Design a protein with these regions (language model features):
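Extracytoplasmic gate region of multi-pass secondary transporters
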Residues: 35-39, 160-171, 241-290
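Central cavity-lining transmembrane alpha-helices of secondary-active solute carriers
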Residues: 56-74, 290-303, 396
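Extracytoplasmic
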Residues: 16-44, 129-130, 266-274, 400
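Conserved MFS/SLC helix-loop-helix module at the cytosolic interface between two early adjacent transmembrane helices
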Residues: 67-109
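C-terminal ends and interior cores of transmembrane alpha-helices
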Residues: 29, 90-105, 322-346
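Cytosolic juxtamembrane N-terminal segment immediately preceding the first transmembrane helix
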Residues: 1-28, 241
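Helix-to-loop junctions at the C-terminal end of transmembrane segments
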Residues: 68-81, 299-312, 337-339, 408
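Hydrophobic core of transmembrane alpha-helices in multi-pass small-molecule transporters
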Residues: 107-125, 258, 341-367
Length: 453
């Protein structure tokens, strides 16, 4: 158990700028979680696609994080975190607006492009916002401060899920019921137009809301100016070499790759797993996912509080170990069925596998900010470039869900969705093993490495 500290987590004079940045965390949570269920929804909009092909949504979304992270670091290096945040928000807005022309083209690929642009903005935004939060106060409270800001992320996630449930999935199911065999091509096309308009609208409206946030940040004169050395005197090559000497940082990048892959895979295939287990519609499966995200949100606040008493690395190792056990429960617990209750919904069927799937989100709640905070320790002037490496590791969210989607197709796909989805959760299980290993490593090595100069 670590000693408690009275050091301020967020200085009072920058509380409003902190709230503005925390709102950014909520807004990328909204997009992330509004997007995950669409992997399955697009199977019905474009029935010619396979599960692995619709998983290209996540490939485009999280692949953009990899491609745009370095440009995000360059912006931070040359112009500072504030302008980096504004650049990221601007591209995020552009991506949301692109959903309108994509909906007119009646093809899957324009949506992939819109997702890529939107997520590219998120990559630049996260590359700047995460280290910006870390730099907003004392280094000894940096991980707790980042966990506090990240606690707003699941608030946006919940909003995204409710939007997806009521503004997308429920409406899509009404349209899907109109589709029958033998319909004329023109009738099918008209319904497809209606389906794509339903998908487009929430993203387009979110982009309009983000314009207001962009203006508030751009015009706020109290946003702190963070100086980590003269950008003109900092050699990128030597900084990269320095980062490659930091074993803790390199392990954090690897852990981040596997953790993000696990999170996106778990949440993306929640709908495949639950609908396959229970034989229900996507909008009904959303009720279980909402429980998971509520617990994810509450648990992130809980873990942030526990960090006053336990080292973040200890909590990371513990949560990762429990996540491994939960993954085993998801794989093998699908046949243990019982009746349960969902608040505000009513009686609902459950399996032990579904319970374990929900509890996995509790374990994941602290992982991203904790890995990011621990990995950023002792980087000094290398923090900006180091942050881009940690954000690039989000590439795991593009590759590992694609692997899990291919496993579902191999194990039976749509014809055996329940068992196929259950077996595919071996992918997150392996990822949590890596996160556990990093938690143990960080626990026994902190904080011994020298700060960069």
């Amino acid at each position: 158990m670590s000693e408690t500290t009275k050091t301020t987590i967020v200085p009072r004079n920058i509380l409003f700028p902190f709230i503005l940045l925390a709102t950014c965390f909520a807004m990328w949570g909204l997009s992330n979680n509004m997007t995950d269920p669409l992997v399955k929804a697009f199977l019905k909009i474009f029935p010619e696609l396979s599960t692995a092909q619709t998983a290209l949504i996540q490939n485009a979304f999280y692949g953009a994080y990899f491609v745009l992270a370095i440009p995000g670091a360059v912006i931070a290096h040359k112009f500072g975190y504030k302008k980096g945040v504004l650049a990221g928000l601007g591209i995020y807005i552009l991506g949301g607006l692109l959903f309108y022309p994509a909906s007119l083209m009646l093809q899957f690929s324009p949506f992939l492009f819109a997702f890529f642009v939107l997520a590219g903005g998120l990559s630049i935004l996260e590359t700047n916002a995460n280290p910006y939060i870390i730099a907003m106060g004392p280094e000894e409270t940096a991980t707790r401060r980042l966990n506090l800001a990240q606690s707003f992320n699941p608030v946006g996630s919940l909003i995204g899920l409710f939007l997806c449930k009521f503004a997308i999935l429920t409406k899509l199911e009404v349209v899907n019921q109109k589709i029958t065999e033998g319909m004329a091509a023109e009738e099918v096309k008209a319904l497809q137009v209606e389906q794509l308009n339903i998908v487009m609208t929430p993203y387009f409206i979110a982009a309009l809301v983000l314009i207001v946030l962009w203006i508030l940040i751009a015009t706020n004169k109290n946003m702190p100016t963070v100086k980590e050395g003269d950008a003109n005197q900092t050699n990128v090559g030597s900084t990269v070499k320095f980062l490659f000497t930091k074993a803790n940082y390199l392990f954090a990048v690897v852990a981040m790759f596997f953790y993000v892959g696990a999170q996106i895979a778990v949440w993306t295939y929640t709908f495949h797993y639950i609908t396959g287990q229970l034989g229900i519609e996507d909008s009904e499966a959303m009720n279980y996912h909402i429980i998971a995200i509520i617990l994810f949100s509450v648990s992130r606040w809980m873990f942030t509080g526990l960090m006053a008493f336990f080292k973040p690395s200890t909590l990371l190792a513990f949560a990762s170990f429990v996540a491994i056990l939960c993954s085993l429960g998801v794989i093998y617990g699908g046949d243990i069925a019982f009746d349960g209750y969902i608040p505000f919904v009513g009686p609902a069927p459950f399996t032990m596998g579904i319970v374990c799937l929900i509890l996995t989100s509790v374990c994941m709640s602290l992982m991203f900010p904790t890995i990011f905070g621990l990995g950023s320790r002792g980087l000094g002037t290398a923090t900006k470039l180091g942050a881009s490496g940690l954000i690039m590791a989000i590439l795991g969210g593009a590759l590992l869900p694609l692997l899990q989607g291919k496993l579902i197709d191999v194990f039976g796909g749509e014809t055996a969705m329940g068992p196929a989805a259950a077996k595919s959760y071996v992918v997150p299980l392996v990822c949590f093993v890596v996160a556990f290993a990093y938690g143990v490593y960080a626990r026994f090595t902190e904080p011994t490495e020298p700060v960069a100069t």
